[in-house]
């Protein structure tokens, strides 16, 4: 399966973020996938599972992203997005999230993107 996004960055290596990274890596023609995590120990575990693009370096993770998936708790989305913008998040990438609610994240981060 070919994706329209050559580089996908997942911010957050918990259950949802890690599962997405594994699913994307398993595609026949996978995009470049970066999985950003805070904890260096998580890097080891993710690499052992076959996620090669796992990193604690936010700049490395977002630099060439065409799609960014926020896979962190809702309360962490705004500060993480600010940090990602400061780290070089491309202006034209698509940003989405895996949160269970949408209004609060939209209210919290829309001013950062306009």
What is each residue range found by the language model?
Residues 1-55, 62:
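NAD(P)+-binding Rossmann beta1-loop-alpha1 motif at the extreme N-terminus of oxidoreductases
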Residues 41-42, 76, 102-105:
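Conserved short alpha-helix immediately C-terminal to the canonical SAM/SAH-binding motif I
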Residues 53-58, 93-96:
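Short hydrophobic/aromatic-enriched beta-strand-loop microsegments
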Residues 58-61, 100-101:
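Short, acidic/turn-prone active-site loops that include or flank metal/cofactor-
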Residues 80-114:
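Rossmann-like NAD(P)(H) cofactor-binding subdomain of soluble oxidoreductases
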